[in-house]
Amino acid sequence: MKTFIYITCLLMAFTVLPTNAEINNISQALNESGRLRMLSQRLAKAYLLKAMDIQPEKVNKQLTDSANKFEQNLIELKAFSNSINNSDTLKVAIDIIDLQWQDYRKVLSQADTRAPADTILALSDRTLVACESLVMQLEKTAQRQSARWVNLSGRQRMLSQRIAKLYSAISLSGNKDLYDDGLQQAVHEFDVALQALINSPDNTHFVNHKLKKVATQWNFSKQGFKSLNKGNSTPLVIFMTTESILNQMNDITALYEAIDNKKKRIATS
């Protein structure tokens, strides 16, 4: 396990959330709305890790940066929805996210009192459901098969953080039975989606190269899940490996965004 942790540390890259940028097209809106899904889970994960005093400086930075990015993305998505035709359903979806976010943010920002894990998990899940609805509506609006890959690859970012969140919940509570079904479901969804992305006919050679790296990292990461099945909890290892996967999937989602936007330009030229 020491070797595993050491190698994991070498593989882990420092996660930097993208700087704010105006959303100009559906492809970008898909990417950035999908990022909201990831942030909903990342915030809960960081909250639980903070409760366990794991990587406190990095975790506190994650909480602040993720909350700021969530709010900025909401602002940009609202502006984008106001700039396109027939966007009433998008506006309603964004308003629902905003309402869920207000409740979530209120609990997250209570510095002097720690909310129960179940409260944070429930709020993160409700926010996730609202964000998922917006992404699906944007994919439907795009009406392109290539838009699916932006959605699916972006969803892998969310799953990386959801896995870390649920693993952290098990580590904090000591109750594997309570959260294990959700954890295993997230792992299964990641497996299935990764295979679908690998088989995408829209992949460039570079996308295939990046996906192969993710597959290698993902298989490596599963060692951490096996240790949990043996009764050993290693939240720090999972924190680091899921960060690496998040970074890689973020790059891949940007590549799919560019592919989708190119197909749109070709179709309308």
Predicted feature residues:
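C-terminal amphipathic alpha-helix
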Residues: 117-146, 227-269
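Extended amphipathic alpha-helical interaction segments
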Residues: 117-205
